[in-house]
Amino acid sequence: MFIIKFFKYLIESIFIYTFFVFIKIIGLKFSRILFSYIFIKLGPLFKSKLLIEENLNKALQDKNLNKKHIISKMWSNYGKVFVEYIYLNRFKKNNNHIKIKGNDILEKLVKDNKPVIFISGHFANFELMSMELTKAGVNLATIYRPLNNFFLNPF
């Protein structure tokens, strides 16, 4: 079983690292557009499709919303987030794309140096929150579960 997982993870990682190189070559702006489109087209082919639809039906129940549009926007967002992982170091140096609301509250927290809990979810590129908090001077600890694919964890 380990050998099957090993080769499965190896092939996945080669595929993903190849995408990463391609993304670096064509740049952030075009990559976000392209991978948004790719994820919209390929995302529904994954086995998670039924789970996504089921969860959306539970969350929205009788609301008369265009659920296909919501799912399409979700896949588009995943494509953009995938691309942005490669550029996290650039974002760390140049934060003109990040808007912090309530910066006065953040400054007060840093000044008061009292314990506080920040809660986030998997919204867009949520890793940027901890990066910006650290840059603002917040003494921060984060919880991280390594990826199942051990070839991708070093990245």
Show the residue positions of the predicted features:
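Catalytic core of membrane glycerolipid acyltransferases/transacylases, capturing the structured
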Residues: K114-F155
